[in-house]
């Protein structure tokens, strides 16, 4: 056996598979990880584990697809939940921190999923994120933000929770329930499940021109001040078939409208950083990828954009398929959704007017009788 063959055999013995943990925290988080395994049961594997963590035993027991279930409780709680109190959720997480610390030993990357605005998800998620950051485990959060219909108190709790989370996590992705038509929150679950799947596959599936895990770490772990938010988004795959002379013009037109309807709070436009993965059908001989890149950069519209490109040549897609992971920075002090804030003010004004009208009606009725 020559030296090269010996080195090759040693290389085959190296175990460097990423260990990834997906933690659904609180009621909404439990629902999402359970839905992930319902729609994509093969996502869970030897190195990719899903967990449901809750202070509500009844809700936790109801989840059937996720097998790793963890109850956080203390002598005052006894598995009855956090009562919508983030401080209680944080306290329960602190009482569980030793177990969580042991549980996450050996992980390289963790995704924390939660609904913000109530107790366990809002309070516990920043606590767990801080533990992971202390252990130097790359961690990101995917969070839902309540609609106005859920009440201003709930929204205020969510906003305060995001400020705490922002100091702990490497980055987070925000889904606004306000954008769910008619309050159908199952839509949020479906969108977030897709985001989790796309994020995991972007990181774990090797490419011929590869995006390695250190690229991913560098993407998420950016220095920030407490005044900065660091948000990310992962797109749905954008697929296109080049089958005519004007295909590049059609590609530009369709990509311009890509993400026009987005349920997340931020799109790829104006992104500071991008990880772009392109699957290209190897049967395409004449494909000017430089033109495609130019179209993508035009949509992102940031001349200081940092980009890392991954490419794979496959036979199982129409022509080209693109995934984009993008990062943004926004001041925490600004409203998360300016349009939503304006709508909130209009609705509050309307409520005040209705209240005043109601008082006039009552006064008028009293005068009659």
Curated annotation (Swiss-Prot):
The keyword Cell cycle applies. It is found in: Cytoplasm. The keyword GTP-binding applies. GO terms for biological process: cell division; division septum assembly; FtsZ-dependent cytokinesis; protein polymerization. Keywords: Cell cycle, Cell division, Cytoplasm, GTP-binding, Nucleotide-binding, Septation. GO terms for molecular function: GTP binding; GTPase activity. Its main location: cytoplasm. GTP binds at residues 27-31, 119-121, 150, 189. One of its GO terms (cellular component) is cell division site. It holds the Pfam family Tubulin. PANTHER family: CELL DIVISION PROTEIN FTSZ-RELATED, MITOCHONDRIAL DIVISION PROTEIN FSZA. Homodimer. Polymerizes to form a dynamic ring structure in a strictly GTP-dependent manner. Interacts directly with several other division proteins. HAMAP family: FtsZ. Belongs to the FtsZ family. Essential cell division protein that forms a contractile ring structure (Z ring) at the future cell division site. The regulation of the ring assembly controls the timing and the location of cell division. One of the functions of the FtsZ ring is to recruit other cell division proteins to the septum to produce a new cell wall between the dividing cells. Binds GTP and shows GTPase activity. This is Cell division protein FtsZ. It comes from Mycoplasma genitalium (strain ATCC 33530 / DSM 19775 / NCTC 10195 / G37).
